[in-house]
Amino acid sequence: LSVDNLLRQSVELIGYFPSIVANAYAVKRHHFGGESLHIHYPEEGLSTAENFLRMIRPDKSYTEEEAHLLDMMLMLHAEHGGGNNSTFVCRALSSSGTDTYSAIAGAVGSLKGPLHGGANAKVMEMFHYIQENVDPHDDGSIRDYLVRLLDGEAGDRSGKLYGLGHAVYTLSDPRAVLLKKYARHMAQIKGYEEEFDLLQKVEELGIPLVQERRHSDTPMCANVDMYSGLVYTMLDIPEDVFTPLFASARIAG
């Protein structure tokens, strides 16, 4: 457990993780979905984002805009202070003297929880329920369904509006502000403007509803999970890969 060896393991994990995720997804798609198995090796000289998009797509094609957006996503998710659940777990495990791989495995186990790294997938699950049950051009219809979600009468019946609120940020989540800007641009390119507009309505109408339920006038904002799932969808990244890709970014922290 020398310092040099720990550093080597850590740097190698940062480098290998995106390829592990991409290849694991290819095997999963082949084994469970019966699709052709496409294994693409990373190409030297390309960024992590470029290689990841290249590796998960059978034809290896991607655009500069897609790679730039994914690169930004990876940076936004790379670290967010030592107090978040998965980083705390990693530090707690490391403090026991365990090995690097055990500490990272524990952190990944924490990250996949629906209240942490799995939240972007829960946002998209909620969004699909909303799409199926509202008139996207009628604010009243959207508001009524959000009330049903909060009452635990619709969706996953958890009584939650995923993607809203943060333990630290109140006025705004700077990650969400930046991501929303680029998500709007990608929606225009990819033809997802209606989906983006509906998600924005969920943000605008949902915040006052949650505040009302909490009997609170404390400012509240959308968090980074509100738009990250839609961005991954626009990048043709399947929901199975949302959280593993988050882990690929967060492993640096």
Predicted segments, located by residue:
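Non-transmembrane, aqueous-exposed alpha-helical and coiled segments at domain scale
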Residues: 1-253
